[in-house]
From Swiss-Prot:
Cofactor section: FAD
InterPro entries (UniProt xref): FAD/NAD-bd_sf, FAD/NAD-binding_dom, Fd--NADP_Rdtase_type_2, Ferredoxin-NADP_redctase_2
Comment on bound cofactor: Binds 1 FAD per subunit.
Keywords: FAD, Flavoprotein, NADP, Oxidoreductase
This protein's name: Ferredoxin--NADP reductase
Source species: Rickettsia rickettsii (strain Sheila Smith)
Binding site for FAD: 33, 41, 46, 86, 120, 286, 327
Family stated for the protein in its record: Belongs to the ferredoxin--NADP reductase type 2 family.
Subunit relationships: Homodimer.
Parts forming coiled coils: none
Annotated EC: 1.18.1.2
Length: 340
């Protein structure tokens, strides 16, 4: 049995920042994540994706963001339990006991759920024989964008991933077709502005009012993508690569059975300290829902800070927290509060 102050479920960017925030408050952390490495979707799905809304970084790729967050958390010696899921929760007096899928047992006073989308997988378009092209011509995630240099690429979708990747790949691709069923994109307004500016050149062509209809190729190598509009008019796009970005399937797994208020794959929390309906359990980042929620990494960072400041009195048995700015703290100090 491991004893600690805080268990953080999820080692994505918000979970890693929660480690830092806990450490600054003198709390020891154990972190559980289902992936083999820390970083969550930023590493597993899109390590080379540029992120534009992190303060002080005009642009930072996801992999570098995770590297910096891990370095920031490192002085507080978090214990990572990777490649395993939190499957059982038992409450005993003022403590929680968590059991993982590898039978790891951890006892803590506070739980921070920063599990993002939970277990995730891509929403695939319903195209005949799409599996024949997957991993060679059809990709749902981008781990190495250099493989797309000089290619003719069809990107399908209208959200942040579709728009951001169209912009990012336009520097190296021969041609990009961005297919969306509407003329209006749901990505960040500045990203949409950049997209439309690039589309004035021949690097990106916006195919709006159309949806994917069929794939054509041989031996797993794509030759063209057929798209169709609402009037059933079709158009053939010469392409080597298809990148469908239609979001992720979400599965909370065992978390859904913990007695938390769950709605549409999200955990309901209060909007002040992001505590769930179970005292001592908080949810932050994309998995948390409250009125006015913004699904941004920086929002998750703020939620991490607020939730852990609120959890302080629980960890330290009612002791009041005297707020300090980070410039007055020793970031190398170690926690002395670990649960006995």
């Amino acid at each position: 049995m491991h004893n600690t102050d805080v268990v953080i479920i999820g080692a994505g960017p918000v979970g890693l920042f929660a480690v830092f925030q806990a450490g600054m408050l003198g709390m020891k952390c154990h972190v559980i994540d289902a992936q083999e490495v820390i970083g969550g979707q930023c590493i597993t799905l899109y390590p080379e994706k540029p992120i534009y809304d992190i303060p002080a970084y005009p642009k930072i790729v996801a992999e570098e963001l995770i590297k910096q967050l891990a370095l920031q958390a490192a002085p507080f010696n978090p214990i990572y339990h990777l490649n395993q899921q939190a499957i059982e929760l038992n409450k005993q007096d003022d403590f929680f006991e968590i059991k993982t899928s590898k039978n790891t047992l951890i006892k803590s006073k506070v739980i921070i759920i920063a599990a993002g989308a939970g277990s995730f997988g891509p929403n695939k378009p319903p195209l005949a024989n799409i599996e024949d092209f997957e991993s060679k011509s059809v990709f749902y995630f981008i781990n190495d964008k250099s493989k797309f240099a000089g290619k003719n690429i069809v990107i399908a979708g209208g959200g942040d991933s579709a728009v951001d990747w169209a912009i990012s790949l336009s520097d190296i691709a021969n041609k990009i077709y961005l297919v969306h069923r509407r003329d209006k994109f749901t990505a960040a307004p500045e990203s949409v502005r950049q997209l439309r500016h690039i589309a004035e050149t021949d690097k990106i062509e916006l195919i709006t009012g159309y949806q994917l209809n069929a794939l054509d190729g041989n031996n797993s190598e794509l030759q063209s993508v057929i798209v169709k509009d609402l009037q059933n008019n079709t158009r053939k796009l010469d392409a080597n690569i298809l990148l469908p970005f239609f979001g992720l399937k979400q599965d909370l797994g065992s978390l859904a059975n913990w007695g938390l208020n769950v709605k549409l794959h999200h955990i309901e929390v209060d909007s002040s300290y992001y505590q769930t309906n179970i005292e001592g359990i908080y949810a932050i980042g994309d998995i948390a829902h409250y009125v006015g929620k913004l699904k941004l990494i920086l929002t998750g960072f703020a939620e991490a800070a607020s939730s852990l400041h609120h959890a302080y009195s629980r960890v330290f048995d009612g002791k009041a927290l005297h707020f300090e700015y980070s410039t007055t703290k020793n970031t190398g100090k170690r926690s002395k509060s670990v649960t006995k």
